[in-house]
Swiss-Prot record:
SMART domains: Elp3. It is found in: Cytoplasm. Keywords: 4Fe-4S, Cytoplasm, Iron, Iron-sulfur, Metal-binding, S-adenosyl-L-methionine, Transferase, tRNA processing. [4Fe-4S] cluster 2 binds at residues 221, 225, 228. Residues 1-15 have a biased composition (Polar residues). GO terms for molecular function: 4 iron, 4 sulfur cluster binding; metal ion binding; N6-isopentenyladenosine methylthiotransferase activity. Belongs to the methylthiotransferase family. MiaB subfamily. GO terms for cellular component: cytosol. Binds 2 [4Fe-4S] clusters. One cluster is coordinated with 3 cysteines and an exchangeable S-adenosyl-L-methionine. Catalyzes the methylthiolation of N6-(dimethylallyl)adenosine (i(6)A), leading to the formation of 2-methylthio-N6-(dimethylallyl)adenosine (ms(2)i(6)A) at position 37 in tRNAs that read codons beginning with uridine. This is tRNA-2-methylthio-N(6)-dimethylallyladenosine synthase. Residues 207-437 form the Radical SAM core domain. Disulfide bonds: none annotated.
Length: 509
C-alpha cells in the first residue's frame, strides 16, 4: 500500500473512527520508502559530518519503564549498528532485555547479502505476529540493510502489517523520532533514506563486551560488484576523519580494551574521498601502531585497493596483527570480470606474494562464491587451484544468491543447482583439508591468546584467539578472562586448537 492508498483508506474509514485522533498529519513525514535507483546515484557533493547528536528535552525519560530487544543478523557492521541503537535506547531511558516476551520494543537489524538471511527475518516476523496479538502495545521494527530494498518494504507493507516501523542504515540517529512516530501512528512508519550517506559522530554506544571493540573507519561502497547489494544499502564510500578514529581508539585503550577491529564495507578505500589531504589506510594504521593497545585488525578488504604502503606498514608488526581477510570470490579472471571485481587472478596472486614477503607469518582467509551465472567447470577448477596456490587458512564459501536490483540478478544462469551444490561440497572439502593442515603446524608451539571467556561447549574451559585469529581452548582460572596469556598448543582440530596455559598474563607495552 502506497501513501496515497493509505490516505484514501483512512478517509474512507473516517466515519467509523470519528472519536479517534486524526493521524493523517504523520503520513507525509513518516512514509519515505526506499529507491534502488536513487541509492545507486553517486555525486560529487562533500560528505556531511554531523557532530552534535543530542536528545531534545521532549525525549528526556522517554523510555523510562520500558524495555528493548534487538536481534542482529549479518556482518560486523550490523553488530556495531546494534551497539549504537542500544546506546540510543539507553539514553532514552529504556532497559535491555534478552526476551521478546519481556520487550516493549523489538527491532530486527537485518542483512540483505543473501536470500537465506532475508528468509530468516521474515520467519521471525511470522513468530512475532502472535506476540503482537497478545501484546498490542508492543512496537516491532525492521531496520538495517533489508529495509533499504524496495521489494522488502513492499512485502512488509502487504504481508506483515503488524510491523510498526521500518528504517534503514542512514538514519539510525533518528531512532528517537521514529519510535515516537510509531507510538502515535496507526500505520507502519517507513523512513528509509536512499541517499549517498553522511558521517554521524558522537553517537552513544553500548558495546557488547569490554575486551574487544568494533570501530567504524568508513561507511559505504562504490565498487558495485555485479552480485552485491551493499552499495545500494550502505551508500557511497565516506571516511571518518583520522583524528576522530584515533581519539575513539585511545579512549577505548584507556578503558581497558585489548583489541580493536576497524570496520568498513571496503576499508582499503579509506581516505580516498578526502579532498583536503592525501591519507589512506596505511597512514591510519601507521598512526595506530603508536596507540597503547595490544591488537588492531581490520575488515573487510578489497584486493583492488590494497596498496603497497599498507603492506609496508603492516610489515612493521607491533600491535598490527598478522591476519588478513582478503576476499577473492573466484580464481577465474573471466569470472572476476563478470563480477566487476576489477582485478585479475594474476593481480591477486601478486598481491598475496607481496603480503607474504613483507609479513612472513601472515595468515590469509577469504570469501568465495561458487555457481555464479554461467560458471564453467574449468573456471571453477581455477578457483580450486588458486585456493591451493595461496594456501588460505580457511574461507567463507557460498553458492551464489541473486539479489534483486543487482546486474547479476538479470544474467542468464545455465548452471544447474545440483552442479552448484557439488562444487560447493568439493570446495568445502578442500577448505577443511587445508584448515587442518594449517592448524597442525601449531602443535607444540607457544602462542599468544587473548582470553574472551568461557568456551561455548564447556564452561570449565577458557577460549580465546591468537593474533592470527585462531580459536584456542584451554583450562585455566576465569580470572584470566580479558588477559593476554601464553598457551602451548597440544591438539589441532579443523576449526580450533587445544592447549595448556604456560605462563601468567602478558604485560602489554
Amino acid at each position: 500500500m502506497n501513501e496515497q492508498q493509505r490516505l484514501a483508506s483512512q478517509q474512507a474509514n473516517s466515519s467509523t473512527k470519528k472519536e479517534e485522533k486524526d493521524y493523517s498529519k504523520y503520513f507525509e513525514s513518516v512514509y519515505q520508502p526506499p529507491s534502488l535507483k536513487d541509492a545507486k546515484k553517486r555525486g560529487k557533493e562533500e560528505v556531511k559530518i554531523e557532530r552534535d547528536f543530542g536528545l531534545p528535552e521532549e525525549f528526556r525519560n522517554f523510555g523510562t519503564g520500558r524495555k528493548f530487544y534487538i536481534r542482529t543478523y549479518g556482518c560486523q557492521m550490523n553488530e556495531h549498528d546494534t551497539e549504537v541503537m542500544a546506546g540510543i535506547f539507553t539514553t532514552l531511558g529504556y532497559e535491555p532485555t534478552f526476551s521478546t516476551e519481556d520487550a516493549d520494543v523489538v527491532l530486527l537489524n537485518t542483512c540483505a547479502i543473501r536470500e537465506n538471511a532475508e528468509n530468516k527475518v521474515f520467519g521471525e516476523l511470522g513468530h512475532l505476529k502472535s506476540l503482537k496479538r497478545r501484546n498490542p502495545d508492543l512496537l516491532i521494527g525492521v531496520c538495517g540493510c533489508m529495509s533499504q530494498e524496495e521489494s522488502v518494504v513492499n512485502k512488509i507493507m502487504q504481508k506483515n502489517q503488524h510491523v510498526d516501523m521500518v528504517f534503514g542504515t542512514h538514519n539510525i540517529h533518528r531512532l528517537p523520532y521514529i519510535l515516537k512516530d510509531a507510538m502515535f501512528s496507526k500505520e507502519t512508519v517507513v523512513e528509509v533514506w536512499s541517499k549517498e550517506g553522511d558521517v554521524i559522530e558522537n553517537l552513544p554506544k553500548v558495546r557488547r563486551g569490554d575486551i574487544k571493540a568494533w570501530v567504524n573507519i568508513m561507511y559505504g561502497c562504490d565498487k558495485f560488484c555485479t552480485y552485491c547489494i551493499v552499495p545500494y544499502t550502505r551508500g557511497k564510500e565516506r571516511s571518518r576523519r583520522p583524528e576522530d578514529i584515533i581519539q575513539e581508539i585511545r579512549h577505548l585503550a584507556a578503558n581497558g580494551y585489548k583489541e580493536i577491529t576497524l570496520l568498513g564495507q571496503n576499508v582499503n578505500a579509506y581516505g580516498k574521498d578526502f579532498e583536503d589531504v592525501e591519507y589512506g589506510l596505511g597512514d591510519l594504521m601507521d598512526e595506530l601502531r603508536k596507540v597503547d593497545i595490544a591488537r588492531i585488525r581490520f575488515t573487510t578488504s578489497h584486493p583492488r585497493d590494497f596498496d603497497d604502503h599498507l603492506i609496508e606498514v603492516l610489515g612493521k608488526g607491533g600491535n598490527l596483527v598478522e591476519h588478513i581477510h582478503l576476499p577473492v570470490q573466484s580464481g577465474s579472471t573471466d569470472m572476476l570480470k563478470i563480477m566487476a571485481r576489477k582485478y585479475s587472478r594474476e593481480h591477486y596472486l601478486e598481491l598475496v606474494r607481496k603480503i607474504k614477503e613483507a609479513i612472513p607469518d601472515a595468515v590469509l582467509t577469504t570469501d568465495i562464491i561458487v555457481g555464479f551465472p554461467n560458471e564453467t567447470d574449468e573456471q571453477f577448477e581455477e578457483t580450486m587451484s588458486l585456493y591451493r596456490e595461496v594456501g588460505f587458512d580457511t574461507a567463507f564459501t557460498f553458492i551464489y544468491s541473486p539479489r534483486e536490483g543487482t546486474p547479476a540478478a538479470k544474467m542468464k544462469d545455465n548452471v544447474p543447482m545440483e552442479v552448484k551444490k557439488e562444487r560447493l561440497q568439493r570446495l568445502n572439502t578442500l577448505v577443511n583439508t587445508l584448515a587442518i593442515e594449517k592448524n597442525s603446524r601449531y602443535k607444540g608451539q607457544i602462542v599468544e591468546v587473548l582470553v574472551d571467556g568461557e568456551s561455548k561447549n564447556n564452561p570449565e574451559v577458557l577460549a580465546g584467539y591468537t593474533r592470527t585469529n585462531k580459536l584456542v581452548n584451554f583450562v585455566a582460572s576465569k580470572s584470566l578472562i580479558g588477559q593476554l596469556v601464553k598457551v602451548k598448543v597440544t591438539e589441532a582440530k579443523t576449526w580450533s586448537l587445544n592447549g595448556e596455559l604456560v605462563e601468567e598474563p602478558i604485560e602489554v607495552k
